Amino acid sequence: MFNIHEDAKKYEEYVIGLRQEFHRHPELSDQEVWTSGRICEELDKMGIPYTRVAGTNVVGLIDTGRPGKTIAFRGDIDALPVHEEANVPFKSEIDGLMHACGHDSHAAMVLGAARILNDHKDELSGKIYVCFQKGEEVGIGARDIVEYLKEQGGVDKAFGLHIAANLPTGFISLTAGPSMAGDCNWQVVVKGKGGHGSRPDQANSPIDCFVAIYNALEAARLTKITP
């Protein structure tokens, strides 16, 4: 069996170089034309077939040809409308845009993982999808990839990768259940009963109920959920 640590060290400069290249060329959500094209170039070099999904999403497939689990790795690829002030050699070349949330690293990480796993495809079983998500910062892209993977038969496990400044280089953190913030919408309807201002006892204010709900949710966030 191959030594994953040795391979990670072998391709360390490859991943760093890609990350810096992506950092120099940030693109906003759903506009990741150069980024997705660059990702496809790397997948072509590796001989990994891929599909463009709903625009600038890219999903590559490493198929070992042997029965086994199906795994997906996902990294997002969009940047933010933020001016970069850092004076580094790989500073953003597009004024007003930068990879301020690490998506340059995520794209490079998934490509690095793809290269290692593809190198050892003959030693593995099952299928591995490498997914590059557009538009994460505005809440798009993921659903299209999920639906595409369902059409292909689904996956047994999916790993959404994200860097963490509190972890040393070379370390990963895994946790059961949610570990980072998500982008979703939900709605609560509180129904009250109107009345005259002089007889609040005959009314039922939805505002009082909503404030109680809000305070309970805020308390849960502060005391029950690890930041």
Spans of model-derived segments:
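Acidic/His- and Gly-rich active-site-bordering loop/insert found
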Residues: 2-99, 108, 115-124
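Residue-level detector of alpha-helical segments with a strong bias toward transmembrane helices
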Residues: 112-113, 202
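A ubiquitous structural signal for well-ordered alpha-helices
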Residues: 18, 113, 213-216
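Histidine/acidic-residue-rich, glycine-tolerant segments that coordinate divalent metal ions
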Residues: 80, 88-98, 105, 122-227
